[in-house]
Structures are given as structure tokens and as C-alpha cells.
């Protein structure tokens, strides 16, 4: 027998005597069951277009009973008998009972004859059996089913509601709030639950029954007055009515789930269709953009001007910078959308997406490849055209510049070559004209290259198809014709000048000699003036001595320079003598130089004035450098004494801290006297600071007389003061440790001797191995076995808690003092608390306040945990855990 059968047999399919007793004991239950079961049957029979009025009469022929079973089971029963005789009715009822039995239901004491005879008790029992099998048995909530499942379902659904506590199917429903809570949980818009009152059960019940009938299609199976007027409502009636709620709401839940599933499928489908549409549109737009862009990139019509080509290049850059990047993003997004769409279709068991013809990703990639190929060709064409136009513009500008320079140079040259100025010129003028003409011929020859370059540029412009070639050719031809004419005129003038050259050669030679000697001498004077007026910046006596030596050497050259000046002036005087002798027209000036005798004399006088000024400046600077050198020596002498003194004191302090003798008080007194002697040295430091200030004011940046800088001295002095203070502090701490721990002076000396013995590098600290050897020498049994290593690790954790890898003397003293002195421990404190507590394992607040000072008592009360031992009393405190926490063996 399955779970339903056993449950049904044990709980509801009671023997006939029990049914009689139930009916006799409480007729109200029979009334409730009649109404409830009738309404339940009609809720199903109406689907077949019929109903019952009297439950014990309308099922007597078995026809409506068979119809009811067909409706609620969804199965066809055996064909009923249509006769009116008793045997036909019994046959139909038996068919119905057989069908019920075929569903695994045991029918106890229910026979067809009783049903046909209209036995109310048997008829109600049979209907209840049908309700159990077809309305309640299939209810399953978590691990429970049937009645327990229905009860659990009710409890879960009504759990959030106040004043509702469903524990059974009788009195838990009397106030009507349970029915209202079930409706509100699933259809909150149907009932205003907040307005219901527990003390108004009739209103609550009628509200629930009316709403269920009107909106949930659940007929009224119960009377509110019967439920309220009955001490214990009929359980079967309540279960039947509640099961209708379960099936109504479970059906709605299934419909909602089905609708959600359909919506989800449709949403996926709609999303996929939208992605397909987006892909098609994006692909179409991208291909259209490529189709429009390629002809623009294939347009290779060259421009005549650089401005026009640069505009094309700027348009192309705008295309690359502004127009193409969004399309690149669109192409990337298109591929992403395509892959995403295919993945979604595959995951949702949909066929793969096939884009329209010509819009495949491969088609877009091919079109994009064509675009980039054309784009690359267009860019190369643009750059080549720009380079060509740049070359043309450069050549055209070069042609214009060279032509303009040449034309400016030739301007007036023909008129100059045609003039007859040499006919009335003096000897010097003829010589000058001849030299000038020679210079012109040289200049003319030099310009030959420019003319050839102009012609070559014009030829290249023609070959490169320059748009303004006609004007270039016309200008070039004009320049060439003019050049030929200049050559002919130049030759004619040379011949005329050479005829008169010898007449004025002597004067010309003198002028030339004057120019050759005047120019170097003039340059020498200008250089001398620059040197004499040049400012100097020196930092040493050697540098100023070098400048003084150079100046003396310069003054030694002045007599020879004066002789050269007189010789140059003599040449000028000789020319004047010749002019006066031969009455030569000397209206012109020396053609070889612009330097006049007056200029030479003026510069010579200026040089003579600058020499004594330079002497004075060098003398003053020499005195300043001597003063600076004295400052250097003065600072160096003091620094060379103070620096080693500081170093010596540092070494002595280090030695004193290691090799201390006598009592700690003697050592402290000695160190303080030593500190006083160091402090008394401060005036010498201050004096050195004053000398350093003078050096800085004199802008002296180096000092060869010492390797010590003021910064070195300051740092050393501060380190010295810090070291002596730290050493004094260490001795003071040792005194505190000795006094606190009761260590004798002999023990302290022994500890110091052992520490210094193993501090072989005199660093003031011991490494792990040195410390271990020191402990062994003091009698500690620390072997190399695991136990010894563990003990040494424990000791190291005490003396080196920060894991620095070294042990200071103070840490060594602290450890040795703990090992040798009689110190208080957690056990001693616990023993003291036990005395105060009267030998109990706990202590009370009153005992603490009675035995300890108020502040210390409150301190203990605030931090002691409650005592939880078997002998605990109210207010007992745990002094043991408190004692261990004081020594870090547990947490406070």
C-alpha cells in the first residue's frame, strides 16, 4: 500500500461504527459535510453541464457518480446501465466503486447497496474518499504529501501574515483570516488584508468565500455561521475547501510559468530578430558607405597648386581621422554582433543566421579590403603629387629667387660698363677702377654659375610640366640675352682700363701696400681693445697671476706695435708727397681699404688709455684673491683639527661602551664628565661656523687646504652628541635593570665581560651564534639536538622580538636578569588571588572591593571574565585567566 493508502486508512477511512458515532455525536459536522461535498461535486459536474441538489439522492442511480469520476480523473469509465431497476443502479455504483479501487484506494465498509439505498453516512464517506484520492493525495510540498503537504502549503503561504497560525484543518480556520491570507498571498488586489480584524470572523469568512466564488471560481462550500457556531469545524469540509484553493492557485502558477516560458522564448526570438535586422542595416549602411567612398579615392586628377593638393590631403586626413574610425568601429561591431547572434542562435537551438546575399561578413571584409587597397593607392598618389608640387614650387621659388638676385645684381651694370670715367681719373682712380673691374670680372665669372643654374631650373620646370612655364621661359631668355651683352661690355672696358694702368701704377702700389699693412694692424688694435676691456672671473691666486703675466707680455709688444703704426703712416705720407709733386688729381680715396690714418691714430690712443686701467683691475683682483686664500687656510687649519678630534672622540666612545670598568655609577659619572668635555668643545665649532660664513660671503667654492666641509663637521658633531647621549642612556637603563632585578655589580660585570668577549667585531651586538656561545659559557645547556635548538629559538624570541638578527647588551641584561632574579609570575599572582578568595577557584566583586584599593579593584572587575566552573555562583569572576593574561599567556 502506498503512502496515500496508509494515510487514508489510518486517518479518514474509519469503520462504519466510527462514522455512526461521529454523526450522532455532532450533527453539525454532517451538515457541513453535506454542503461542502455537494459544492465540491458541483464544481466538477458543471464542467459536464449538470449538478446535484441532494447528495444522498442524486448519486443513488450511479450515473452522476460515474460522470463525476470521469470529470475529475479525465478517464472514461465502463458504459453505465440505463435501466431504472435496483440492479441497474447497483451495477452503476459498483462500476464507480471499482474505478475508485483501481486507483489503489481501499473502500472500507462502503457497498453499492448502501449508496443505492441513500445511506447518508456511506455516501459522504464515499465522496470524502474521492476527494482524498483526486484532490488531496497528489498535493506534494517538499517531502510531504496529501494532508501534511496541504497543511505545509497553507503554513508556508500564510507565514508572513499576522494573527494567522495554521496548525490544523479545524479551529485554525475559524476566524477566517487563514482563507483571506491565502487569497491575498496570491491575489493581493482582491482583499485589503490590513483592514481585517481577528475579532470579526463572520466578516472575514464571508469576505473570503465571496471573493473566492467571484474571482477564483471556487464555489461556496462552507457557511460562515456554521464554522463560527461550531466549537470544532469539520476537518474534512475544511480540507476539501482549502484543497480547492491549492488547485486554483497551482493552476494559475502553472499558467504563469507556461506564459513566462512562452514570453522568454518569444523574447529570445525577438531579440535575435532585432540583432538580424541590426546586422542587415549596419551591413547595408557600411557597404553603401564603402561604395560611395571608393570612387572618391579613385579620383586621381592632379592639381596645379600646392594649396589645392594640400586641401585634398587635408580632406583625406579628415577622412582618416573623422569618417573612417566610426566605420572601423561599425565593422568591428558588425562582426561582434554577427558572432553574438550566431552564438545565441546556437544556444537557443535556432538555425544559424544567413545574411542577405552580398552582406556576409566575408563580403564586407572583401569590400573593406578593396577600400583599404584603393585608400593606400590614393594616399601614395597624394604624397607623390605633393612631392612633385613641392619640387615644382621649390624649383619655381628657387628660379624666382635666383632670377631676382641676378636681375638685382645686373641692375646698372651695363651703364657702369659704358661710362668713360677713366679718361679724367687720376692714377689712383685708374688703378682702383682696374682693380674694381678685375673684381667685377671675378664677380661676373662667379655669376656664371647662377645663370647656368637659372637655365637648368627653367629646363627642369619644363620637363616637370610646370603650369607657368611660358613666363619662366621668357624671363630666362631675357636673362641669357642680357648676360651675353654684359660679357661683351666687360671685355671692352678692360681693354680701355689697361691702357692707362701703367700711368698710375706707382700710386696704386703704395695704396696697396698701405692697405695690406693697415688691415692686420687695425685687427690687432681691435683685438687688444677687446682683451683690455674683457671682464674676468677668477677663484685662485694662480689664475690672477696668469692674467697678470699675460698682461705684462702684452705691454712688452707695444713698442713694436708703435713702430708698425709709424711705418703705415709713412706710406700714407709718401702718397701725399707724390700727389703734391706730380699734381695728380686725388679726389678719390684708397680703393683697397676704408681704414684711414685718423682711425689708426684714434684706436692707438684708446689702447694706450686702456693699459693702465687693466693694471689697476688686475692689482685689485690679486689683493682679493690673497684675502680669499687666507680665509681658506684659516678654515682648513681649524677643520683639519676639529674633524680628526670628532673622529677620535667617536672611537673613544665606542671603546668606552665596550670596555667599561668599575661600577655602573662610576661608568655613568665618567661618561657624563666625558660628555661635558665634548660640550665644552662647542665654541670651536661655532668659530668654524663663523669662518665658513665668511667663505660663503666671499663666494669661495673649494678649499685645497682641507678635505673637511662644514657639512661634514656638522654631521660628525651631531653624531658625536647623539652617540654620547645614547651611551649614557644605556648605562642608566642598566642601572634601572640592576636595581629592579636585584642584580649584583659582580653579576653585571660578569655579564659585560661575557658579552664583550663574544662581541668580536666590537659592534655592540651579538649575532645568533655569538649569543649562543655566550649562553653556553654562562652555563646554559643548549645542545645541537632538536630540544636544544627549540630552547635557543625560545630565548631568541625573547631577546630579539623584532627578529633583527642581533642581540643588544640591554636585551642580554634583561634576559639574564629574568633568569637569575626572583620575579613575580602568573602562578604567583593566581596564588595571591586564591588567598583573597578564601581558597576558592573564583573571586567575587565584594571580595575584590574589600581586599584591593578602589581603582585597582574596579580595574580587575572590568577585565575579569565570568567564572564558568561547576562550583560557580552568581557574580563569580575568573581570576585565573585574568592572571595569565597579565603576563601575555592569554588575552584579556
UniProtKB/Swiss-Prot annotation:
Full protein name: Alpha-actinin-1
SMART domains hit by this protein: CH, EFh, efhand_Ca_insen, SPEC
UniProt GO molecular function: actin binding; alpha-actinin binding; calcium ion binding; protein homodimerization activity; vinculin binding
Principal cellular location given in the protein's record: cytoplasm
Organism field: Macaca fascicularis (Crab-eating macaque)
Keyword list, A-Z: Acetylation, Actin-binding, Calcium, Cell junction, Cell membrane, Cell projection, Cytoplasm, Cytoskeleton, Membrane, Metal-binding, Phosphoprotein, Repeat
Region (Actin-binding) location: 1-247
Modified sites of kind N6-acetyllysine: 95, 195, 676
Residue numbers spanned by region Interaction with DDN: 274-733
Name of the encoding gene: ACTN1
Residues found modified as Phosphoserine: 6, 471, 677, 890
Swiss-Prot/TrEMBL Spectrin repeat ranges: 274-384, 394-499, 509-620, 630-733
Localization (cell): Cytoplasm, Cytoskeleton; Cytoplasm, Myofibril, Sarcomere, Z line; Cell membrane; Cell junction
Amino acid at each position: 500500500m502506498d503512502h496515500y493508502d496508509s494515510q487514508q486508512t489510518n486517518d479518514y477511512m474509519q469503520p462504519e461504527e466510527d462514522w455512526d458515532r461521529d454523526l450522532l455525536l455532532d450533527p453539525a459536522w454532517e451538515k457541513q459535510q453535506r454542503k461542502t461535498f455537494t459544492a465540491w461535486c458541483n464544481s466538477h459536474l458543471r464542467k459536464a453541464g449538470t449538478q446535484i441538489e441532494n447528495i444522498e439522492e442524486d448519486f443513488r442511480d450511479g450515473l452522476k457518480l460515474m460522470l463525476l469520476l470521469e470529470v475529475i480523473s479525465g478517464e472514461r469509465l465502463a458504459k453505465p446501465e440505463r435501466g431504472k431497476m435496483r440492479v441497474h443502479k447497483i451495477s452503476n455504483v459498483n462500476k464507480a466503486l471499482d474505478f475508485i479501487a483501481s486507483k489503489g484506494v481501499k473502500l472500507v465498509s462502503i457497498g453499492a447497496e448502501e449508496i443505492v439505498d441513500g445511506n447518508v453516512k456511506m455516501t459522504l464517506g464515499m465522496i470524502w474518499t474521492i476527494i482524498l484520492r483526486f484532490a488531496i493525495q497528489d498535493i506534494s510540498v517538499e517531502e510531504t504529501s496529501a494532508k501534511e503537504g496541504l497543511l505545509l502549503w497553507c503554513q508556508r503561504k500564510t507565514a508572513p501574515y499576522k494573527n494567522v497560525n495554521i496548525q490544523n484543518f479545524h479551529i485554525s480556520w475559524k476566524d477566517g483570516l487563514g482563507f483571506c491570507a491565502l487569497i491575498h498571498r496570491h491575489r493581493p488586489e482582491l482583499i485589503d488584508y490590513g483592514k481585517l480584524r481577528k475579532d470579526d470572523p463572520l466578516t472575514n469568512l464571508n469576505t473570503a468565500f465571496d471573493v473566492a466564488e467571484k474571482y477564483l471560481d471556487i464555489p461556496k462550500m462552507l457557511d460562515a455561521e456554521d464554522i463560527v457556531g461550531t466549537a470544532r469545524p469539520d476537518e474534512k469540509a475544511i480540507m476539501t475547501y482549502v484543497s480547492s484553493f491549492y488547485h486554483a492557485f497551482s493552476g494559475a502558477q502553472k499558467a504563469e510559468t507556461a506564459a513566462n516560458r512562452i514570453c522568454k522564448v518569444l523574447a529570445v526570438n525577438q531579440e535575435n530578430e532585432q540583432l538580424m535586422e541590426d546586422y542587415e542595416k549596419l551591413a547595408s549602411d557600411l557597404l553603401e558607405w564603402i561604395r560611395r567612398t571608393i570612387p572618391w579615392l579613385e579620383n586621381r586628377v592632379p592639381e596645379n597648386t600646392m594649396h589645392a593638393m594640400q586641401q585634398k590631403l587635408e580632406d583625406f586626413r579628415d577622412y582618416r581621422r573623422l569618417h573612417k574610425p566610426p566605420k572601423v568601429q561599425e565593422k568591428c561591431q558588425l562582426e561582434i554582433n554577427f558572432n553574438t547572434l550566431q552564438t545565441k542562435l546556437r544556444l537557443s537551438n535556432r538555425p544559424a543566421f544567413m545574411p542577405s546575399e552580398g552582406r556576409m561578413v566575408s563580403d564586407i571584409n572583401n569590400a573593406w579590403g578593396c577600400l583599404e587597397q584603393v585608400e593606400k593607392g590614393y594616399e601614395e598618389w597624394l604624397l607623390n603629387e605633393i612631392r612633385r608640387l613641392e619640387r615644382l614650387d621649390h624649383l619655381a621659388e628657387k628660379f624666382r629667387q635666383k632670377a631676382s638676385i641676378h636681375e638685382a645684381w645686373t641692375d646698372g651694370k651695363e651703364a657702369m660698363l659704358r661710362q668713360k670715367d677713366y679718361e679724367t681719373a687720376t692714377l689712383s682712380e685708374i688703378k682702383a677702377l682696374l682693380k674694381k673691374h678685375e673684381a667685377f670680372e671675378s664677380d661676373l665669372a662667379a655669376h656664371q654659375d647662377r645663370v647656368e643654374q637659372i637655365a637648368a631650373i627653367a629646363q627642369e620646370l619644363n620637363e616637370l610640366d610646370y603650369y607657368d612655364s611660358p613666363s619662366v621661359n621668357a624671363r630666362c631668355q631675357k636673362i641669357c640675352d642680357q648676360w651675353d651683352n654684359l660679357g661683351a661690355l666687360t671685355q671692352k672696358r678692360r681693354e680701355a682700363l689697361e691702357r692707362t694702368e701703367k700711368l698710375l701704377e706707382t700710386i696704386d702700389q703704395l695704396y696697396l701696400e698701405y692697405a695690406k699693412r693697415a688691415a692686420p694692424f687695425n685687427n690687432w688694435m681691435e683685438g687688444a681693445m677687446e682683451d683690455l676691456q674683457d671682464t674676468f672671473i677668477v677663484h685662485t691666486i694662480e689664475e690672477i697671476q696668469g692674467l697678470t703675466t699675460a698682461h705684462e707680455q702684452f705691454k712688452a709688444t707695444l713698442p713694436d706695435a708703435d713702430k708698425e703704426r709709424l711705418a703705415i703712416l709713412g706710406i700714407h705720407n709718401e702718397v701725399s708727397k707724390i700727389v703734391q709733386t706730380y699734381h695728380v688729381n686725388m679726389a678719390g680715396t684708397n680703393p683697397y681699404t676704408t681704414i684711414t690714418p685718423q682711425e689708426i691714430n684714434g684706436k692707438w690712443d684708446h689702447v694706450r688709455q686702456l693699459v693702465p686701467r687693466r693694471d689697476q683691475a688686475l692689482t685689485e683682483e690679486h689683493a682679493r684673491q690673497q684675502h680669499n686664500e687666507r680665509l681658506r687656510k684659516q678654515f682648513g687649519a681649524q677643520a683639519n683639527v676639529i674633524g680628526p678630534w670628532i673622529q677620535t672622540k667617536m672611537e673613544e666612545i665606542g671603546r668606552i661602551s665596550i670596555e667599561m670598568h668599575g661600577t655602573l655609577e662610576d661608568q655613568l659619572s665618567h661618561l657624563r664628565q666625558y660628555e661635558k668635555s665634548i660640550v665644552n668643545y662647542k665654541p670651536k665649532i661655532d668659530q668654524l661656523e663663523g669662518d665658513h660664513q665668511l667663505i660663503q660671503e666671499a663666494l669661495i667654492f673649494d678649499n685645497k687646504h682641507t678635505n673637511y666641509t662644514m657639512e661634514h663637521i656638522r654631521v660628525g658633531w651631531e653624531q658625536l652628541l647623539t652617540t654620547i647621549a645614547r651611551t649614557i642612556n644605556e648605562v642608566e637603563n642598566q642601572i634601572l635593570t640592576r636595581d629592579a632585578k636585584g642584580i649584583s655589580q659582580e653579576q653585571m660585570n660578569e655579564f659585560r665581560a661575557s658579552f664583550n668577549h663574544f662581541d668580536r667585531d666590537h659592534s655592540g651586538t651579538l649575532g645568533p651564534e655569538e649569543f649562543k656561545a655566550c649562553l653556553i659559557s654562562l652555563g646554559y645547556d643548549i645542545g645541537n639536538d632538536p630540544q636544544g635548538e627549540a630552547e635557543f629559538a625560545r630565548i631568541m624570541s625573547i631577546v630579539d622580538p623584532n627578529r633583527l638578527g642581533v642581540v643588544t647588551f640591554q636585551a642580554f641584561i634583561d634576559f639574564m636578569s629574568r633568569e637569575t632574579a626572583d620575579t613575580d609570575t602568573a602562578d604567583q599572582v593566581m596564588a595571591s588571588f586564591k588567598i583573597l578568595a578564601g581558597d576558592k577557584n573564583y573571586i567575587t566583586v565584594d571580595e575584590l572591593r574589600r581586599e584591593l584599593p578602589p581603582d585597582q579593584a574596579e580595574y580587575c572587575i572590568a577585565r575579569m571574565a565570568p567564572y564558568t566552573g561547576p562550583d560557580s555562583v552568581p557574580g563569580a569572576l575568573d581570576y585565573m585567566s585574568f592572571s595569565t593574561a597579565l603576563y601575555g599567556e592569554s588575552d584579556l
